[in-house]
């Protein structure tokens, strides 16, 4: 017990020794502010105390062979504020000597009284106050720059506990107020961020759809494994035209194709007559395409040889009828048939214009007339033979200037037998 009491008395005596030479009225800072030199700080300090600067371990820091003494005051910058927001720091400076006094007199007299001078003005929003060591009654002052200072309370022993408790209560009040302000600032910043995102992120629905269509490459399901891809240029996304311009058909529908009937025309020759099966051609609907393959060509050559064998060398036949027989086997063919396949579904056909009905009817009439011509010629030949037999019997009676009917029929082969008697 004696050792503990002796330690406490030694600490108190040491502290008194540090504070006694520099002790002054605790209201000196308030009196200085009331003097009118510092007009902005009209309101008196809320709390004022004397401190000495120590290090983190509690050891006193000496400056010019003495302790660094400082007066700390917390006050309002304006009467409208409800909570203090300013921290003031003041130091004692020795008073100026008079010039009239001689050096000898100045040495004999006591030193002049020290004067309190305001040296620092710190807003509390840039300062953090906390209790560093409650046993030694030291506080920690941390600035916004990161530097920290440790201050130990310096006052008379019977006032230390009361005054230090006031500082602890003030520090807790200031910290609570800082926490509220920080929360309000965070909420305001978050609201500002949400508002900015609402403003900048607000987009029209049409804008959203256009951007999704531009980001995805257009893929047209053409027929087959090939796909048509088109990349969009952003400044020209409004000028994009549809690529499905082949036939403007949906993807799943198959275009209707007109029926194309391939008909092979078979020609039969019976006794120098060409008979064509025209009934199939007239009844078929759509486009009639005639293909002549090698077999048909061979058949035609054989028919021509048969015609040569059938016709007698002494038979009279006009050259015009031969040319008509040759020309009778005309075939209407459709040329320039181009089939363009796009994959497996789409195709285009380009055909030459189809002949008119008048031309087809004319050809049919020509064919029927050609069929009738051989019959008519055969009857004419028979009549000529009978007439030649009759004329041979009457040659003696006829005069020499009259020509035989056979020669007349050679000139006019199309006349019938009754008209030749005239």
UniProtKB/Swiss-Prot annotation:
UniProt keyword annotations, A-Z: Cell projection, Cilium, Flagellum
Species of origin: Homo sapiens (Human)
UniProt entry tagged with the keyword Nuclease: no
Keyword ATP-binding: no
Basic and acidic residues bias: start-end ranges: 360-374
GO term, biological process aspect, one: flagellated sperm motility
The protein's name: Golgi-associated RAB2 interactor protein 2
Family to which this protein belongs: Belongs to the GARIN family.
Region annotation Disordered: where it falls in the sequence: 353-404
Domain of life: Eukaryota
Subunit field text: Interacts with CALM1.
Location relative to the cell: Cell projection, Cilium, Flagellum
Function comment: Seems to play a role in sperm motility.
A Pfam family annotated for this UniProt entry: GARIL_Rab2_bd
Tissue specificity: Expressed in spermatozoa (at protein level).
Entry's Gene Ontology cellular component terms: sperm midpiece
